[in-house]
Amino acid sequence: MIKRLIVISILLIVGTVLCGCMEQENVGQQNSEAQEKIVLKIFHAGSLSVPFEEYEKMFEKEHPNVDVEREPAGSVACVRKIIDLGKKADILASADYSLIPQMMMPKYADWYVMFARNEIVLAYTDKSKYKDEINSTNWYKILQRPDVKIGFSNPNDDPCGYRTQMVLQLAELYYKDPTIYDNLVLKHSNIKVEENNGTYLILVPKELDVDTNKLFVRSKETDLLAPLEAGAFDYLFIYKSVANQHHLKYIELPKEINLGYYEYADTYKKVALKIIAKNKTINAKPIVYGMTVPTNAPHKKEAIEFVKFVLGHPEVLENNGQPAIIPAVAYGNVPEELKDLVKIEK
């Protein structure tokens, strides 16, 4: 009897040890699998949040070993994270393609692809003042009313913000009314304008100071959506794609000023904007999005695969109200994996 008890006890001890070893082995395998998962970091413009969320889910489904992590922000802020703060990203997607050659090349990038278009519209809600009166011909007059508050993103951080300034300066030329930009922005901020022989240079100070009774400003354009819908201000200058994605009402602006059409490039270039903090001058031009894999990207192979995935699924952009450029136009040392999907320009 005693011998049987001893044998049973030994068997129980051995069984417990074996189970423990198996559990540790399983935990070890799970930890190993978790460690092997690649984190693909993407810095992208806020206006790309909706389509890139779709791309993230689609890409992860096809690549279960990859975890896509997105950091939306103003495009200038995205670039600054890389070139000023030393942060590493696998992909940079900007709402203004020119930021890549102007701010990143050649040290932080050696190629880029132009893959989507957009235009600026004036969005509003049922809470906006004079919503039943405003239209595509009187919008600039409605905005000048003293009880109307307008919103735009910070031109120091976000292309949508500096494009808004360009649109309003172009509006003065289009409507032949030199008071529009003055009354809407210049009188209510420390932004200045210099005029020289029919061309205009908008000067944006390092620290933007605005009259909050008239202007509502946040870092990136998508930060303004919730306040607009809550009635914190009345009208928002924003990309048409974002307005469509969030089911906002909006006024379409004339093609001559909305920065959406190549055929008006010569008109747009009458206006430029200088970001004093970076000593960068940006010419008004048609809105084109750009994407690159930074030279110090931790996971270049997977990053190029993601760019290839985006270029191969333009319908995601189109379905979200953002016209895709087909084929995409690429510049620089374009990776071999992308060459069949792009038109390479010198």
From Swiss-Prot:
GO MF annotation list: metal ion binding; molybdate ion binding; tungstate binding
Q: What are the record's GO terms for cellular component?
A: plasma membrane
Ordered alphabetically, the record's keywords are: Cell membrane, Membrane, Metal-binding, Molybdenum, Signal, Transport
Annotated GO biological process: molybdate ion transport
Q: Does the keyword Membrane apply?
A: yes
Which Gene3D superfamilies is this protein grouped with? Periplasmic binding protein-like II (3.40.190.10)
Which residues hold molybdate? 46-47, 75, 158-160, 221, 239
Function, please? Part of the ABC transporter complex WtpABC involved in molybdate/tungstate import. Binds tungstate and molybdate.
Know the name of this protein? Molybdate/tungstate-binding protein WtpA
Q: Which organism is it from?
A: Methanocaldococcus jannaschii (strain ATCC 43067 / DSM 2661 / JAL-1 / JCM 10045 / NBRC 100440)
